C-alpha cells in the first residue's frame, strides 16, 4: 500500500530546485505508473480513488507552475527517497484522502446489497443513492410502485390500462360492482336477451327459465340429429327443401338426354314423370345408403316406362 508523508518544514520547498514543465510531467507520469503497479493488490474501489486523487494533484501542480508561485508542489522521486513526499500545499488533499474512499466503499457495499434490500427493504434515509430508489420500482401482484416512492400503492383496473395480460384467471370472490370482460359476440347476445326479457316483462308474460339437459334421452336425441358444417343442428324443413331441389335439378338434367341409339328416339318429357316416381326419388335421396346406387336404376326405369 502506498504511504503518503507530509513535510512540515517550510524550507523543504525552497531547498528543492525548480525544474521545467517537461521534467515535472515525466516525473508525475512515472509516479502514477509506479503507484498503479504498487496498488494492483488493493481492491478496485481504492485503486480508482487513488487515481482520481493523483489526477487532481497533478492538475493542481500544473496550475501552480503556470501562475508562477514561489513554492513548487511536486512529488518526490520514488526511486531516490523510497516513498513519495508531498508538499504542504497538498495537505488538504492528504487529510481528506481517506474520506472519499470510505464514502465510495460505502456506496459500493450498499449497491451490492440491492438484492437483500429488495427482499427485506431497509428504512429509507438521505444517504441512499438515487439509483437504489429507482431499482425498487417494480410491479408485484397488482401493485405498482411509482418512481421516488418508498411504499407501493395499489392501482385498480390494471386490465383497462393494458398492464396485465389478457389471459388472467378470474378471482374467487368477484364483487358485484366489478366489470366482467366478454367478447363482442357474447356482448351482443347479452343485450339481445335483456331486450327480450324487458319486452316480455312489459307485456306481463311469464318468463320461462331455460332448463339444461336433465335426462339422458335428450342427450341421445341431440347426438342423433343431423349437424351442419359449423356443428349446428340442421332444420328438418330445410332438409326436405334441399332434397326436393336436388331431385328436381337431377330430373331437369335428365331431360336433355335421349334413349334411342340413333338419336331419333323421343326425349324424356315432363309428363312421363309421375308423382309416385317423384316421391320415390325423394325417398332415395333422403336415404344416404342408396343415394348414389339408386339413381341409375330410377333413371333407367323412368326411361323404359316412357319408351313403352
From Swiss-Prot:
One GO BP annotation of this record: seed development
Subcellular location: Nucleus
Domain of life: Eukaryota
UniProt KW keywords: Abscisic acid signaling pathway, Activator, DNA-binding, Nucleus, Transcription, Transcription regulation
Tissue distribution of the protein: Expressed in the whole plant, except roots. Present in etiolated seedlings.
InterPro entries per UniProt: CCAAT-binding_factor_CS, NFYA
Pfam families associated with the record: CBFB_NFYA
PANTHER family in UniProt: TRANSCRIPTION FACTOR NF-Y ALPHA-RELATED
Protein name, UniProt field: Nuclear transcription factor Y subunit A-5
